[in-house]
Swiss-Prot record:
Domain of life of the native organism: Eukaryota
UniProt xrefs under CDD domains: ICL_PEPM
Chain residues that bind Mg(2+): 174
Protein name per UniProt: Isocitrate lyase
Organism: Dendrobium crumenatum (Tropical pigeon orchid)
Gene, per the UniProt record: ICL
GO MF annotations, alphabetized: isocitrate lyase activity; metal ion binding
Enzyme class, first EC level, given as a word: lyase
């Protein structure tokens, strides 16, 4: 007769599983996740893990990032940063800024996985930005090791005089739209964790038509679809056991299209045609007929423009308001109905189109013509009226699933910032906000004085925007320095280099002046000497290295050899 007892291996396996589930539940009860909502259980997470547990350096950086941002939030200040292009920039930034940003735009234009540059359409391989994160994170780790070796080789007096640089500044990376469905987002987030990202942001545009936040033609996905992306990202972080900071971005302020009308929270912002003459003349059908007749290019565009100009596009709410105003009623009764409509459909209530029609019927405006389907684009997208209100609705929906909310804007508008912050804080008072100090804005045309520009960051920080960043700061800084130096080098030769680069490095204490030392030649000399018993005749920084010229001493110059040597000073802060 077969034994009914359970083999010890099975009970041990079950015990390990239950213990891990309990550990995850305890982890989720910590203050770090007090505001986080998950539609899945700890059992789901543990079921997706393997038996070999990993630890990730990025998790330490994520915890550091969380502490940094919460500290700024409490103080009413902001972590300010910009997009870093390379190890030089990331090490220079570390001396002055407490976070690092990795921009998808910069990667798209300067460093894709295929080396094929282009605009920010998120059409590069999905490992492009994770690769850049690893590039910068490895540089951070290396310069941290290099500094550590240098400091432990100093006397206490020397260390006291040598500023310590925290090279391990947390990196927040651009996750674009998640690069596809839920499984694509999961795999992307796994890469980010493995490559060193402390935080990741994901936006609510369609992954098929993704654009830079400051381009036209942006298409949103439904609120529910973007929530699925955020949940997929959080699930992957949970499976890996990390506290990666998740930033949810919305492009709802400037978006003009949306993929579908499936989510009722989007209904109030979708546009429909109100011209009853167009009842059986959808835009898509009109354009298809024109194309079948051989119309192309500018002619086809003119047909579309004419249709749109005569269709009477507006939201359902505006159509109802117009309908009430056309009613043959005393003015006081019209106003009463308008007030009732406004109160019943206040934007934060997210009234669906079906609910709105019921209210309109009650107010005598149920017979209005309004059709959101006939106005759809040839691609099938619905027309969308972007606004701060739309961004608030989306931000509120995303907040339980994200750590920060970022509203992409088209200009640096303090009123707009205040409106968004107030809308978010009304329902999520502890949520952290992010702001793109975009170089796509013409800041000089924004109507601000120099003083107002200087105070812009601290002013919106007090509103709750505790992480602020210039997405393409590294790109523009690199372009400016290279262009101006190249121009002057072409005219003045080495004088341009000495005046614009070498002397400025010296005057500002930039450690790349001694680039051999910056690159770690001393550090690897330590390796060589350690391997060879303390001495090495092939040490890179040994006798004969030209970097000795940069020590604080006078030396004989080489200018005017026909007139004899000229003494020049070559001082540096080594």
């Amino acid at each position: 007769m077969a034994s009914s007892s359970v083999p010890p291996m099975i009970t041990e396996e079950e015990a390990r599983f239950e213990a891990e589930v309990s550990a995850v539940e305890s982890w989720w009860r910590t203050d770090r996740f007090r505001l986080t909502r998950r539609p899945y259980s700890a059992r789901d997470v543990v079921s997706l893990r393997g038996t070999l547990h990993h630890s990730y350096a990025s998790d330490q950086m994520a915890k550091k990032l969380w502490r940094t941002l919460k500290s700024h939030q409490s103080a009413g200040t902001a972590s300010r940063t910009f997009g870093a292009l390379d190890p030089v920039q990331v090490t220079m930034m570390a001396k002055h800024l407490d976070t690092i940003y990795v921009s998808g735009w910069q990667c798209s234009s300067t460093h894709t996985a295929t080396n094929e540059p282009g605009p920010d359409l998120a059409d590069y391989p999905y490992n492009t930005v994770p690769n850049k994160v690893e590039h910068l994170f490895f540089a951070q780790l290396y310069h941290d090791r290099k500094q550590h070796e240098a400091r432990v080789s100093m006397t206490r007096e020397q260390r006291a005089k040598t500023p310590y640089v925290d090279y391990l500044r947390p990196i927040i990376a651009d996750g674009d739209t998640g690069f596809g469905g839920a499984t694509a987002t999961v795999k992307l987030c796994k890469l980010f964790v493995e490559r060193g990202a402390a935080g990741v942001h994901i936006e609510d545009q369609s992954s098929v038509t993704k654009k830079c936040g400051h381009m036209a033609g942006k298409v949103l996905v439904a609120v529910s679809e973007h929530i699925n992306r955020l949940v997929a990202a959080r699930l992957q972080f949970d499976v890996m056991g990390v506290e990666t900071v998740l930033v949810a971005r919305t492009d709802a302020v400037a978006a003009t299209l949306i993929q579908s009308n499936v989510d009722l929270r989007d209904h109030q912002f979708i546009l429909g045609a109100t011209n009853p003459d167009f009842k059986r003349r959808s835009l898509a059908a009109v354009l298809s007929a024109a194309m079948a007749a051989g119309k192309t290019g500018a002619v086809l565009q003119a047909i579309e423009d004419d249709w749109l100009s005569r269709a009477g596009l507006m939201t359902f709410s505006d159509a109802v308001i117009n309908g009430i105003n056309r009613q043959n009623l005393p003015e006081y009764e019209k106003q009463r109905r308008l007030n009732e409509w406004a109160a019943a459909t206040e934007y934060s209530k997210c009234v669906s189109n079906e609910q709105g029609r019921e209210i309109a019927e009650r107010l005598g405006a149920g017979e209005i013509f309004w059709d959101w389907d006939i106005a759809r684009t040839r691609e099938g997208f619905y027309r969308f009226r972007g606004s701060v209100e739309a961004a608030v609705v989306r931000g509120r929906a995303f907040a339980p699933h994200a750590d920060l909310i970022w509203m992409e804007t088209s200009s640096p508008d303090l009123v707009e910032c205040g409106k968004f912050a107030q809308g978010m804080k009304a329902s999520h008072p502890e949520i952290m906000l992010a702001y793109n100090l975009s170089p796509s804005f013409n800041w000089d045309a924004a109507g601000m004085t120099d003083e107002e520009m200087r105070d812009f960051i601290p002013r919106i920080a007090k509103m709750g925007f505790c992480w602020q960043f210039i997405t393409l700061g590294g790109f523009h800084a690199d372009a400016l320095v290279t262009d101006t130096f190249a121009r002057e080098f072409a005219k003045q030769g080495m004088l341009a280099y000495v005046e614009r680069i070498q002397r400025e490095e010296r005057n500002n204490g930039v450690d790349t002046l001694a680039h051999q030392k910056w690159s770690g030649a001393n550090y690897y000399d330590r390796y060589l000497k350690t391997v060879q018993g303390g001495i090495s005749s092939t040490a890179a920084m040994g006798k004969g290295v030209t970097e000795e010229q940069f020590k604080e001493e006078s030396r004989t110059g080489t200018r005017g050899l026909d007139r004899g040597g000229i003494t020049v000073n070559a001082k540096s802060r080594l």
